[in-house]
Curated annotation (Swiss-Prot):
GO terms for biological process: defense response to bacterium; defense response to fungus; killing of cells of another organism. It is found in: Secreted. The modification Isoleucine amide is found at residue 143. Residues 19-43, 74-123 form a propeptide. It comes from the Eukaryota. Expressed by the skin glands. Residues 1-18 form the signal peptide. This is Maximins 4/H3 type 1. It holds the Pfam family Bombinin. Belongs to the bombinin family. The modification Asparagine amide is found at residue 70. It comes from Bombina maxima. InterPro entries: Bombinin (IPR007962).
Length: 144
């Protein structure tokens, strides 16, 4: 008779273990789905922020370009205007990277392409950071 109880208890334990494993698998799959959804939301928010940042930089560059386009310009103003135009072109090329890369890479070898992109990164980052810094500095002065 003890043997029957041992078999019954073993069967009961095995079925309880199987049910708990099944619940664990279901909860893991639900957790994976939730994580995937949250990652999609984060990517969506990141995309929106990036496009908003690009739009803001384009707007800032256009405003500054219009400011320097009107009236007499010094050599320094002319240089700033050239940089702003280059930044605007580079920002436009971010919207259509395939077309821009096709235009820029026609007739270049790989080393020239690498140098071009390094120069392009410096050309984008330098003026953009300078413009953002100047704009923030002006805002801080107005607030303070």
């Amino acid at each position: 008779m003890n043997f029957k109880y041992i078999i019954a208890v073993s069967f009961f334990i095995a079925s309880a273990y199987a049910r708990s494993e099944e619940k664990d698998v279901q909860s893991l799959s639900q957790r994976d789905v939730l994580e995937e959804e949250s990652l999609r939301e984060i990517r969506g928010i990141g995309g929106v922020l990036l496009s908003a940042g690009k739009a803001a930089l384009k707007g800032l560059a256009k405003v500054l370009a219009e400011k320097y386009a009107n009236g007499k310009r010094t050599a320094e103003d002319h240089e700033v205007m050239k940089r702003l135009e280059a930044v605007m072109r580079d920002l436009d090329s971010l919207d259509h990277p395939e077309e821009a890369s096709e235009r820029e890479t026609r007739g270049f070898n790989q080393e020239e392409i690498a140098n071009l992109f390094t120069k392009k990164e410096k050309r984008i980052l330098g003026p953009v950071l300078g413009l953002v810094g100047n704009a923030l500095g002006g805002l801080i002065k107005k607030i303070g």
